[in-house]
Every structure is written in C-alpha cells, then in structure tokens.
UniProtKB/Swiss-Prot annotation:
PROSITE patterns: RIBOSOMAL_S17 (PS00056). Part of the 30S ribosomal subunit. Belongs to the universal ribosomal protein uS17 family. It comes from Streptococcus mutans serotype c (strain ATCC 700610 / UA159). One of the primary rRNA binding proteins, it binds specifically to the 5'-end of 16S ribosomal RNA. It comes from the Bacteria. It holds the Pfam family Ribosomal_S17. This is Small ribosomal subunit protein uS17. The keyword Secreted does not apply.
Length: 86
C-alpha cells in the first residue's frame, strides 16, 4: 500500500526558545467569498527541529508527520533562507 503525499508548508520561524521545537507562522492569501477582496490569513504550527538549526526569522519548509507530542505534527525539512541579523 502506498502512502499519500505529505503536506509541506513554507513559513517564518517566530520562536526557537524550546528545545528541539520551533514555532512557524504560515501566511496565506485568499479571496473573500462575497466581496472578492484579498485577505491575509496566518496560522502557527509547532515543528520538530532535531538539531536546533533553525533560528528566529528564518524561512523554513516543514512537512507533516506522525504526532510527536500533544501539539507537534510537523517536522523541519530544510532552512530555505536564513534571517539577516542587523
């Protein structure tokens, strides 16, 4: 039996204070069903970061996985773009 394609999302790391866990905010745009105006939606996901490589401000790709804790359902795949430190 073949496994389904897992969902991948790209977002920005907003917190890396927990050990082996990052909080990623994923922003999407959708049209309002009646008025047609573009509306920004954002949702936060907790993701598993085994080696603590992602830092706050990084753009990362996360992938859906089995439940790793009460709130973690995603894991870090790669750091797409590192944050610029000023």
């Amino acid at each position: 039996m073949e496994r389904k394609q897992r969902r991948t999302l790209v977002g920005r790391v907003v917190s890396d204070k927990m050990d082996k866990t990052i909080t990623v905010v994923v922003e999407t745009k959708r049209n309002h069903p009646v008025y047609g105006k573009r509306i920004n939606y954002s949702k936060k996901y907790k993701a598993h970061d085994e080696n603590n490589i992602a830092k706050a401000g990084d753009i990362v790709r996360i992938m859906e996985t089995r439940p790793l804790s009460a709130t973690k359902r995603f894991r870090l795949v790669e750091v797409v773009e590192e944050a610029v430190i000023i």
